[in-house]
A protein has these predicted regions:
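Short, linear, compositionally biased motifs with a strong N-terminal bias
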Residues: 12-15
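Small-residue-enriched, tightly packed secondary-structure blocks
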Residues: 24-190
């Protein structure tokens, strides 16, 4: 009958629309993941150019994480947000994550930074992935010299077994300015 044909057509149309929306969302997720992977490779290449010893540190660590962030500062307040991924060197598993931060203090401008975390131990790596992490509200952390040719030369020790390199538009930073920044899993991408 006509009502059954209309019903079947509506069900088919709804299924097609649902599938189209799902496929579009899934393709956007895949595209975002690929953009993060590309940004990760770019950040690592830049780091290795500025600090060749970082390659050894990352290759021999339990894992690493790379985050690209954009910060905006308007007068007395500011913030930054970004995305990245953490890679377990043993399993090669990629976990996609987000970062968000707030900053107080006088300033004006937009800054792009890349943070590269190096996790010496599996427990430090797993804690970062599963529990997230937060830089406190205190001031900047200075990079350790690490000795000539030191494995973590130019990196900042931010927790036991966790070192961070920061790259700005002007090169490898001598301090980490990620205060008030929180890192957590990106449920939409994992």
């Amino acid at each position: 009958t006509v009502s059954r044909l209309i019903h079947a057509a509506l069900v088919t149309l709804l299924m097609a629309l649902s599938f189209g929306a799902y496929a579009q969302d899934e393709s956007a997720v895949i595209q975002t993941r690929n953009e993060i992977r590309e940004a990760t490779q770019d950040a690592l290449a830049t780091l290795y150019e500025f600090q060749p010893s970082a390659r050894y540190a990352i290759d021999h660590a339990a894992g690493y994480g790379v985050f690209s962030a954009t910060g905006i500062k308007l007068l007395f307040a500011g913030g930054r947000q970004g995305r990245g991924m953490v890679v377990n060197n043993r399993t090669h598993r990629q976990t996609f994550m987000r970062m968000i931060g707030v900053q107080a203090g006088l300033g004006l401008g937009i800054a792009r930074t890349r943070l590269i975390f190096v996790f010496e131990t599996q427990s430090a790596l797993q804690n970062f992935i599963n529990q997230g992490w937060e830089f406190g509200a205190s001031g900047s952390l200075a990079a350790a010299a690490g000795g000539e040719g030191g494995m973590f030369n130019g990196a900042v020790s931010v927790a036991p077994g966790v070192f961070v390199y920061q790259i700005t538009d002007t090169g490898l930073a001598a301090q980490i300015t990620a205060t008030g920044t929180r890192f957590f899993k990106d449920d939409a991408l994992n």
